[in-house]
């Protein structure tokens, strides 16, 4: 049994003693040990587990960068209990049967699975492992994420909640498809109407990476010129945001904008939300903690997509969080090898890890900086993303008033993230 005494509940401020049965008090180390004992938790806060609707776990196809096991452990280490896996796996997560000999196909086929969605839904059974976080899946908007032909709902509808699958209700699926995206690029213009029709048919939402550009590696401006690297103009993001706002107005389909990074995009989103349009947006810790000037110190380690923007854009990002324009915070956790990241600006891949350190970074910038409260930060990292992902946000204080076994187990599932404040 694990007893945490004098722990603070995140939303009510109540100081409580929290008792967790040994069967539920699982530790994260590889030995799978159990935490037991009686601890004074004064100065700690118990909160709903964080949820991240934007992670890249590289499994299958690139497990030398990250596997489901290492990705889920990273999430758990950062206090996350729910994540949404993006579809840029290898092969891509479009629901089609993989072909023998294709990159990454062996992992799927050797597991006795037909496609990537099937592989990830059965990962724990196939690999005989218990992962420490829940995960849902995001399906490709286009076949192979190529932007050429829209993915076919017939290939993935069976993986949604509410659809019959092999004689059992799909609500029993541990890892359903809950969103559609071609993350890494925006949905191409010629496919957008069909993709939105697919989204509407499935009752999901579209996640948009708001960029279309063929050149450039960092933000266009004085830093890109100093580095001698082609720049990416800020309006590449705005063009997609503006386009999709009009489509949301026209169709009524919920569009969620990923990792928004520019002041002009936040302005457009702010105005659209004032109209009541069905749009939401996120930003990521690196856009509120860093700007393109940090490339001069960190080099390609700070290369990402969208790129780190100007100091003005960084402040606009913080302001958009403070005024409620930003609905939630997501990490865009995207691991690569050090060898890959140390290539030149034109060759190094985009991406940065973030699950382990997201709360600390956001707390330092936003709470210590006086922009928002810690309670609001937890809402942005837990309640709001859980709601987007289709999970019912759970009030920990309310759980503590139900029967002890239910309270302890469900509270642990949602909240074994003890936050120093």
Annotate each PLM feature:
Residues 63, 95-100, 114, 214-226, ...:
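Histidine/acidic-residue-rich catalytic or RNA/ligand-binding cores of hydrolases
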Residues 7, 43, 54, 75, ...:
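Divalent metal-coordination and catalytic microenvironments
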């Amino acid at each position: 049994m694990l007893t945490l005494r004098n722990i603070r509940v995140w939303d009510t401020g109540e100081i409580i003693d929290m008792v967790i049965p040994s069967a539920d008090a699982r530790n994260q180390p590889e030995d799978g040990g159990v935490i037991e004992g009686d601890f004074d938790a004064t100065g700690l806060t118990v909160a709903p587990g964080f949820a991240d609707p934007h992670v890249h776990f590289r499994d299958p196809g690139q497990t030398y960068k990250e596997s489901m096991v290492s990705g889920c452990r990273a999430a758990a280490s950062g206090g996350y209990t729910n994540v949404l896996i993006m579809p840029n796996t290898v092969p891509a997560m479009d629901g089609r049967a993989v072909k023998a000999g294709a990159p990454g196909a062996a992992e799927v086929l050797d597991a006795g699975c037909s496609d990537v969605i099937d592989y990830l839904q059965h990962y724990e059974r196939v690999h005989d492992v218990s992962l420490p976080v829940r995960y849902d899946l995001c399906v490709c908007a286009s076949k192979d994420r190529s932007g050429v032909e829209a993915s076919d709902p017939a290939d993935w509808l069976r993986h949604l909640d509410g659809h019959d699958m092999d004689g059992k209700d799909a609500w029993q699926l541990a890892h359903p498809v809950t969103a559609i995206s071609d993350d890494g690029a925006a949905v191409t213009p010629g496919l957008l109407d069909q993709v939105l029709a697919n989204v509407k048919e499935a009752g999901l939402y579209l996640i948009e990476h708001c960029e279309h550009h063929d050149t450039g590696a960092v933000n266009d401006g004085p830093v890109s010129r100093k580095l001698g690297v082609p720049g990416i103009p800020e309006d590449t993001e705005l063009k997609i945001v503006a386009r999709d706002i009009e489509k949301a107005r026209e169709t009524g389909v919920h569009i969620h904008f990923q990792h928004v990074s520019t002041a002009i995009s936040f302005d457009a989103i702010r105005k659209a939300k004032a109209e009541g349009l069905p749009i939401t947006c996120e930003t990521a810790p690196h856009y509120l903690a860093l700007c393109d000037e940090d490339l001069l110190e960190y080099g390609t380690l700070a290369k990402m997509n969208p790129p780190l923007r100007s100091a003005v854009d960084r402040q606009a990002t913080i302001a958009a969080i403070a005024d409620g324009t930003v609905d939630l915070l997501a990490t865009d956790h995207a691991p690569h090898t050090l060898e890959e990241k140390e290539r030149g600006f034109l060759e190094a891949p985009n991406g940065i890890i973030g699950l382990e350190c997201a709360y600390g970074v956001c707390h330092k910038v936003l709470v210590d900086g006086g922009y928002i409260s810690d309670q609001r930060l937890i809402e942005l990292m837990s309640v709001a993303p859980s709601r987007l992902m289709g999970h019912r946000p759970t009030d920990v204080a309310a759980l503590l008033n139900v029967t002890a076994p239910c309270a302890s187990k469900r509270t642990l599932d949602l909240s074994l993230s003890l936050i120093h404040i």
